[in-house]
Every structure is written in structure tokens, then in C-alpha cells.
From Swiss-Prot:
InterPro entries the UniProt entry points to: 6-blade_b-propeller_TolB-like, Strictosidine_synth_cons-reg
Side of membrane Extracellular, spans: 62-416
Protein's name according to its UniProt entry: Adipocyte plasma membrane-associated protein
Lipid bilayer topology: Single-pass type II membrane protein
Chain positions with Phosphothreonine modification: 19
Transmembrane stretches, start-end: 41-61
Phylogenetic lineage: Eukaryota, Metazoa, Chordata, Craniata, Vertebrata
Similarity field: Belongs to the strictosidine synthase family.
Any matching Pfam family: SSL_N
Residues the record lists as N-acetylserine modifications: 2
Amino acid sequence: MSEADGLRQRRPLRPQVVTDDDGQAPEAKDGSSFSGRVFRVTFLMLAVSLTVPLLGAMMLLESPIDPQPLSFKEPPLLLGVLHPNTKLRQAERLFENQLVGPESIAHIGDVMFTGTADGRVVKLENGEIETIARFGSGPCKTRDDEPVCGRPLGIRAGPNGTLFVADAYKGLFEVNPWKREVKLLLSSETPIEGKNMSFVNDLTVTQDGRKIYFTDSSSKWQRRDYLLLVMEGTDDGRLLEYDTVTREVKVLLDQLRFPNGVQLSPAEDFVLVAETTMARIRRVYVSGLMKGGADLFVENMPGFPDNIRPSSSGGYWVGMSTIRPNPGFSMLDFLSERPWIKRMIFKLFSQETVMKFVPRYSLVLELSDSGAFRRSLHDPDGLVATYISEVHEHDGHLYLGSFRSPFLCRLSLQAV
């Protein structure tokens, strides 16, 4: 055989595949499977350790609220006069970090007055803050101190150079800001038709100063628990009338869900009352042929109304600290028909924690004298104006009160 024939008969060596049951590859596979099982078991144990206490808490803890299912219409579309804008961002902040919670505002001449979260009624003049009244006693550092400290909310200028003030915990007062004199008109400890007043809120006064119309937002919840009142949907609020001469008190309308801001009409024939939980404003007739009657002034509002104040155009300003976005998702509308979720939320979280999830969308509405939407001013992210409670018009400006911000805002009407 030649050398060439030998080369033709040789075949290339093929690599051998060795399969050895005792080899290293299977050991690595078994190790990986073991690690995976350890991870899964650890994850499962961690999940169980977290879930069981959570479920136990949900089962054993009592919810502070007993919410009732509520039904809302689809919110109005934010179009036309409701179209979002940033006009509120043109406002300037006043007395920033010098006061907290200037809920309501009144002027006597060019001197401004408001109430603060630490229980004071203060005068704001020439950039200075001066305390003129206090209805409770200190210390007044936290929300839990409010029942002792008092919390001035609605404030109005009377016809004789005095102020009428509604304190959430103490009742109705008349204050002479020049002499620092305080007169208790109606104590919140006075039962009205068998019910306590737990949350005196806003007030409006006739031009002669004789009658005061005011809201008691709840006979169950206090102001410091306002979020529980909203979420529970309690219908124990009332609109009342106080006669400063006879000292008589009448219930004008009851079974209201968080009655809040109030405003007399220019003719003093009806009173508007914001029913915050229901996103609407009711009208109650207090004189004339329709006296004693009531109807809806505005329903299905784009937000939850707080105080109502007159506008120079003959209509009304309404402050709102949050809205019902459409298009968009309204958490409060969603929760309204799901009381079981509300119970669960407040079993696990405090009011302050829940408030952090409430959108900081500030909205101001101007209504016509018939309740039509005339214009709207927005701050979609609450960058300048936050937690708006009231819109007070004075001398070509809007003063924006707030129930929790450490400032108030001033906005020129010429800018909007």
C-alpha cells in the first residue's frame, strides 16, 4: 500500500463526549436548584410574616369610621370656563412661615384679620402680625391640642367695627379688635335641639348684625378629624340661625354631609351652604315668599367646596383644595361607593398619612348669581397656592385663605 493509500484510509479523530454521572456539571445543577429552593422558601416565609400580621390587623383592628356608600354623577369635564390653567401661580405669598392655617379672612378698612391654627385671631397690618384674641389656652402645638386651644375658622366684619368669629371648638364670638374685648355669643357646649355642636365652622352675618347664620359641620366629629368626617360621609351637619338680640337658635336645615362655608345673598333672602362631602352648594331661603324652603344652587361641582364669599360682579367665589378631575381619576369618587376600602385604609393609616396622597390641586371658582360657572383659576400642582379654604375679595385683589398652609396668598384681579 502506498503512502497515499494509507492517507486515504485514515479518518479524522472525532471528539469524544464523556458522560459521567459523577461529573461536576450535575453537581452544579443540583447546587443551583438548591439555591433556588432556598430563595423561594425565604421569600415565602417573608411574605407570610408580613401578610399574616397585616391580615390580623385588618381583622382585629376597629376602623374609626363607619362609612356609608355614596353615589356621585360623573364629574363635569374640565373644558370651557373650567379648562385648567395656572393663573393662581401669579399670586404672591404673604406672611410665609409666620402663621399657619389662615382659614378665613376679613377686612375692616384696609386692616386684615384672620384666625390661625394655634387658636389666635390676629391683625395683619403693615407687614406685622398682632394677636387680638384667643378663645382657648395653650400650649397649642399639635392638632390634638385644638380642643383646648380653640381653632378660629369663619370670620366676618360686623356693622359696628367688630368681628364675628366661629371657633370650631368654642362657639360664636364677637371681638372688638381695637379694645381687645371678647364676647361669647353662643357656646359650643350648648345643645341645639338635643344635639351637641362638635364642629362650628363658618358664619355669615346680616347687614344690621342681628342674625348670624352658621354651620355646625358635625355633632360627632371635631375639626381635627375633618378627613374622617369626609370619608365617613356622616349626615349629621346642620345650618343654624342665631339671633344676637333674643339669643335664640334655630335649625334651618339638617342631615347635611359636612356643611361648610356659608354666604347670605345680597338681598338677604337666602343663605348658600357648601355641602363639601357631596360636592355641591345648597340654598336655604330665610325670608320672603319661599322662606323655609331649600333647593340645590349648584350640584356636581368639579371639586369639593369650602368657604363661599361674595364677588364684586354680584356672584360668589368658592375655594376648593382638591378637585374631581375629568378627564382623570378621582380617588374620592372611586372610594365613595366602596366603603370597605375606606374602612381598611383608616385601620392601617393615620389622617396625616392619608392626606399625603390627596392631590394638591388648588381651584377657585367664580359663580354667577344663579350658580353658573363664570370662570376658574387653577394651580394644578399646588406650587404657589395650596389647600385653599376661602377666596376673599378686597380692593381689586383676591386673598386666598388656607386651612393648613403656613401663609396666605394675594392675587391681583387685573392679572387674571
